[in-house]
Amino acid sequence: MVLNEIHIYQLYLLSQLFNKYRYLCFTVFYSFSSSSTHRYPTLPPHHLLST
């Protein structure tokens, strides 16, 4: 029972870490792509996040 809870907690930590790295990669990718999309200044960032 205790080992099962530890295993679930490790999976939870891995998922949190994966979400954090995915968000980090997305922000880096967005910062690189935003430099090439300066000709569309009227497009808000949350519109790109929703698609």
Curated annotation (Swiss-Prot):
Q: Indicate what this protein is called per its UniProt record.
A: Uncharacterized 6.2 kDa protein
Organism name: Thermoproteus tenax virus 1 (strain KRA1)
